[in-house]
Every structure is written in structure tokens, then in C-alpha cells.
Amino acid sequence: MGDDRNIVDTPRSVSSVNAAWMQDRMVKNAMDFSQFSPGVYAEAQFGIPGVPYIRGDLSQVYYGGQLSLYSLNSTPPSLNGVDSFDIVKGPGSAVYGPQGEGAGGYTDFVMKQPYFDRQHTEISATLGYWASGHSYSNPSVTIDTGGPLSDKLAYRVSYLSRYGDGYYLNDHDQTQDVYFAVTYLVSSRLKIEAWTQFFEDRTNEVVGANRVSQQFIWNGTYVGGPASPVTTGPNAYFGYDIIAAPNPPPNTYGTYADGTYVAVNPATAYTVKLPSYYALIGPGDTARSMLSQTQIKATFDLTPDISIVNRFLNYFGHSDKFEASSYSEFVPREQSVQDRLELHDEFSIGKVDSNLITGLDFRYSGLTSYQDYQTQPFGYYDVYATVNTFFYPGYRYEGNTFGGGLQVPGGAGFSASPGSDGSQISNVYDTAAFIQDDIKLTPKLSLTPGFRVDRIEAYAENPAFVQVGFYNSNFQYQPLATPIYIPAGGSSPYTPGYNNSDTVTDQSFFLSLNYKLNETSSFYMTYDHVDAILGTNNFGGVDGYTLQSSLTTKSTLYEVGYKESFLGNTLYFSSDVFQQLKYGTQFTGPAFPIKDEGLELDLVYQPNKRWTLNGNFTYQDATAFGTYFYQQTGNYLDYYYPTTTVDGQPGTGLGGLNFVGYSPPGGRMRAPGIPQVQANGFAEYRSPMGWGVGAGPQFIGRQYANDQGSLHIPGEIEYDGYVFYGRRTWDVRVNVKNITNKRLLDPIAVSFAGNDLIYVRPPIEASLTVRLHF
């Protein structure tokens, strides 16, 4: 909310995760967040999960109450500098500002702070991982140290180094990460807190296994064998769509195949149990990102009741990916500069107490991005037989692109798709004024209204390209004899560009009513209605093709909840019911409305220093509305001929990819991939002798793996745990994930690729962590 109120008095569903939970349960990315909070689910997101799903929609990350740039799976947030985090449902408050993407909720990182009492040093080393059937090396070391330099100045430094591989063949997981923080007590009235961070990593997109079927979901039975373009049926020879020579005569048809409209040859097809560590990753595939960010907070106390707070956040990053099978991404600039000035005033009018926050907020965000997923022939590859030889068959014929025919100037090997909002240069200037007042009407009843107005100026255009080919009116790729340079915002005779700008005024309203039955409880009702930017699915930014609607996307939250702390603050319980109305984005296609309604329960119990228990439960009914949801392939059976039986059904022989859209009956369907029921529990015991154990289940209910509901992932239970032993200056911990060695899966980009791909999580795996404390 932008103030210092406690979690019980916050009129929102909030879950707090402390440093001990993060360390003990080895929180590494957004896929680990759901165990701590109801309403949170994190799918694999192509192996680089940057943000979780909250209440049926994507979410965003804040740092100390300031909005970070959105990144679905390109630049994942670093946790090296994070001391704890809060998971908040719904839009950001009047003070924080609503999210620019992912209106479901947000994760607010609380950064590591310097120590003023004495010098503290911790060295932590993790060795692993021992996994069933396929162990892999991924050691990491963290050095975290800090202390006072004087009675007014203190510092903290944390360095993380991780080398080695991920679980899947050809997967990498490498990071170098430095975090530095200082706190300076300038005077009794002025305090300055600052931190800066730089990290770079090399990982891989893990798109999972292809040729998905229900039998593969159930038991790993995979249909192998070579695939080629279908030569019968309504899509016969559509896969031969690359013309050999430039400037062909009219009505020339292609002679080369690009991997689309393919079906597995029934004469050579076979079935095999696919190892879970086989995925569509080539030996030369890579995903790299770099991020530099700095935050400075200055607090000046004018009087005991009035203070001025200024928060500054600067963020700059870039990333790139190259997957020889299907995808190219080049993001040379992700930039954000935000400065928020706040006036905090506590005052009384008669018997009514107020805690007022008002101020001004300015935020600039800039993005330059290219991506090419014009043709992603997932079903063309036999993952079992050709795990080290994935290469897009049309790459050389299509001018070293993945079907887009647009090269990136100065970005050797990278390419772009025409007409994609993922290729953009955008600059957004957001100037806002806000006010929020926590009004204590009676000792038990308080009202918190808020209002925010954002004046947004946005400029968006296509970036510069070098065009080497295009798709003609017959959907045939035609190479150009002479490449054409297209300047930023420009066009060619074959590819229209765009250069748009707009200015809008977004108004957001917030209202909460809070009633305290006693000092340790609260019953609240919240209504929030916000206008905010809805950017692109992958990188945020804006949708330059539909700029005005992109800048004024509405989201509404209705929430009623009850919270209480019992038994001398050893037991915390919260419950809420909610309805959220918002918009989601597609990789290809228009934004679509989402309505999510549900019930959330959360409990934390620490009766003494030995026992800690927590659990949560979610029931949600998330519905997506729309008449068109783009699909790479319309039916998973399209990859098989009618003479091939899969899941007891004959193939359609249509071939995939086949670039279609799905129109759900009645214009509505369950939100793609979102489970209706989730539950998590965990218990930890610490012996006075220094040893301890923790374990608990994570349950995810049935999930539809494609829009049609013809593929589903049954309910899954994953048990994780650890054992440890420690003394005052050291401790040792062994973590085990998926203790019961269950087959666990996640949907991937359900609307877009649900009929093509599915993600298989690792089986049982273990790691060893040793920590030294000084």
C-alpha cells in the first residue's frame, strides 16, 4: 500500500516469504513461488520462468515498491540481492501504480540491507544435482558479507557464481551476480538507502517435448520417426513453400520444405518411452541476458509526523536467444527510469486519524526488441533419435531467418517476423499524481480511498530490418535478389511498417474498508478499478499496432477477506473471496478478457522455536473470453496420418504446424493452463541438538494442456523436503525435490503451442548445501 502497515491490516491478500524459507527451500525462480501463497501458479514458461501466474493471469515484479520492467522469460529476476518478498494479489496501489503487464498481481522484492551491529559474513556452497537417470553438475557459491563502516554508514555485498548445466540435455545454467548496498544516516532526520546490482547469465529455453499426446502425458510414450510434409488431403504439399530462386515468374510454387504441415511417416513410426531429460534443445542453443539496476531511497523527517520520501530506480538490460530448431530473439535495450516523490503526513481532525500519502511519479521505459517465430516446426523433429541435430530446415533457404525474411542489422544470425508486436522500438513517458489516505473513522473502522492519474505519452515503431525475402499472396516464401534495408518506422513493398504515437490520461480508483474485531484481526472489503498499459506477451513495452487500446487497458478487483493472528502471534490465518476482471495477451492475436473468481486460504503456525507449519488452498474459476485464439497447430492428431492410431484415435493427416485459430463454444473457455484447485503444505522441525527436517506436498489440480481440452494433465502431487544439521558457525543441508519420483508435467503456452509441446519436470533430485557463518 506504500506505508508501513502490517500484513493483518493490509486490505489485500498478501503472503510474505522470509529469508529462511527462501534458503531452506532453495527458491531459484518464479516456479518456486506457488508453494508459499494461494492463487499463485508458475508454469515452466519455456524453461525460464520470469513471473508467476497470479489469479489466472501473468504478474509483475516490483523492487521496494517500484515497478520493474516486465519480462516473461527473457531476463529472469535475480534473487541474489533479495532478502524476502511479498506476493500481492490484484493491481498495484495508488502509490505503487498499477502494473503495465500482468494485472493478476505482483511480487515485491525486499532487498538485503546493511548491518549496523557488527560484521556479518556467510559463505554458502551448493553441490548437485543427483537426479534419477541423469545427474548433472551445477555448483554454486554465494558470499554475503556486510557491516558498519561507522556509526552512520554501513554496507553489504553479495556475490553469486553458478556454473554448469541444467537437467536437460544441452541445457546450461550459468550466472555471475554482484549486489552492493549501503545505508547512510546523514543526520537524525535524513536517511539514504541505496543498492546496485549487476548480473549476467547463460541459460536455455526449454520448450519441453514435442509430439504431445495423452499417452505421453500419462506414461511418457512418445511417437518417434521422421516427419515430412503431407502429400494428401486439404493441406497436401503446403509444407513445400520455399521458392528456390529470387524473382520467379508468376504462380511459381515452392520446392523446399520448412517443416510445416508435416506428419510422421507411418512406415517408419515407432513408440518409445522418452527419457524426461530429452527436450527440444540443440547443442548450440543459448539464451543470454544482462541486467544492471540501481535503487536509491531518501527519507527526510520534517516533523515526527511528516516525512518526505524519494525513490529512484534505474534498470537497464539486454538479452538474446538463438534456438536452431525454431526461434530467434534479440533485445539490445530494455530500459526504465523511475522517480517517485512522496509526502507522508499523519494528522487528526477531531477524533478521526489520517495517514496521508500523496506525491508525483515519473517513469520512462524504453524497449528495442526483435523476435522471429514465424515458423516453429516443433513436430518435424524426432527428439528421441535426433537429440543433437535439431536445425530448422528452412533457415538457409530463407536468408538465415526462421521464416520471417527480416534480418537484424548488426545482429548477425538474429532475425524478425513481419507484423509482430514483439519487434518494436518503443518509448513511454508516464507522469502521474497520486493520493491515498488511511482514515481511521473509529477505533475499529477505517477507510482507505486512493486515486491516481497517469498521463502517458507513447511512441512506437518497427525497428530497422534488412529484408531478404517475403511471403507472397500464395503463402510461398520468395527470396529477394537484392536485400532491402528498411529504416526504423519504415516499410518495404512487401512488408508494411508502422510509426505511431498517442497520449492518454489513465485514471485509477482504489477503495478499501477495514473493520477490526480486535487488535489482531481485520475484516476488509476492497474495490480497485485501474487503467494501465497492456504490453506484449514476451517483453512488455506496448502494442504499437493498437496503441491507444494498449495504453488504456482496464482491470477491476473485488475482494472480501478476513485475517487474524492468534495465540500470541504464533498462528496467522487469512481467507478471501475475490473476482478480478482483466485482459490477457497472446503471442499472436488480440488481447482477451479474463474473469477469475475464487477462494483463497492461507495459514502459518509457529507454536515454538522447534516447529513451523504453513499451508494454503486455492479454488479459482478463471474464464477466458474471445472468438479467436491463435494456435500453431489446431489438433495434436494433425501430426499423424489416418493410418496411425494415437490415443485410440486415427490421425487427421492435416499436418502441423498449420497456423489456425480456435473459437471456443459460446466465446468462452477455462483460462489456458490454469488449475482450478491448488493446495500446499509444509512442516519443519528443529531439534535443540542442531538437526532438523522439513517436508511437504504441493498439489496442482487437473490442467487442460490445450484450448480444446482434448489434452489434460491429471492432478499432481510433488513432495519436497530437506534434512539439516548445524552449529553456531556452520550448517549442512540436503534438499530433495520430488521425493516420491512422480512424473510431473506443465503445460507450455497453452493457446499458442498446447497441441505441440509439453514440459516434463525433473524426477527426484538432490543437492548438498554447506554454509559458514562468521
Predicted regions and their residues:
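Acidic, small-polar-rich N-terminal luminal/periplasmic segments of exported/outer-membrane proteins
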Residues: 1-117, 560
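Outer-membrane beta-barrel translocator/receptor signature
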Residues: 81-83, 95-179, 186-190, 292, ...
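Outer-membrane beta-barrel domain signature, strongest for Gram-negative TonB-dependent receptors
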Residues: 177-369, 559, 572
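Structural signature of Gram-negative outer-membrane beta-barrels, strongest in the C-terminal barrel
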Residues: 185, 353-365, 424-582, 596-597, ...
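Solvent-exposed loop segments that connect transmembrane elements
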Residues: 206-278, 326, 376-421, 459-503, ...
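Face-selective signature of the C-terminal outer-membrane beta-barrel domain
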Residues: 292-316, 332-465, 516
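Gram-negative outer-membrane beta-barrel transporters
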Residues: 570-571, 576-583, 590-708, 740, ...
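C-terminal beta-signal and adjacent terminal beta-strands/loops
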Residues: 622, 699-706, 724-774
